[in-house]
Amino acid sequence: MVEGDSQHYAQMPYYLVPTVNSTDAITDFASKGYYVLMPTAQGIQKTDDVRDTVTIESLLTTSDSAYSKIDVNSGSIEKTDDDIEGPFDLGVSITETLDDDKETQIVYYSSSSLMDSQINQMVSGGNEQMIMESLSWMCSSDETSTISVPAKDL
């Protein structure tokens, strides 16, 4: 995934700074103006062929100028006619409502570097904040709605 808009990447066009969309999974995070950094992320393709009980929402999105390289071994990040044009989802939440009014919730982010401490520091803890809010959303119930993380020594 390569970002063509310099306002949506940091240092290199494959260090993506996506748009954060306000959804149930990350509402507070989105309203606080944090940034997210997703190096070497992959685009997520949503399908329309899902059960009626399933809802897929975009959490993180590239700009319209992003593109997916078809030939990743070409040695070039320049856009070619063969490349797939964006925008792309880089994070989604998936909810399925069951018959007994219970829900199954999944959050998927497409960068394996999202939780890397150096990457997180580059956005002043934004990645960690988003992950924690996502976990809190998935774990919330009538009994509890908070997640506790032990303090770290710096």
Named regions from a protein language model:
Residues 1, 144-154:
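Acidic/histidine-enriched alpha-helical segments
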Residues 1-143:
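Acidic, S/T/G-rich, low-cysteine, solvent-exposed domains in lumenal/extracellular/periplasmic regions
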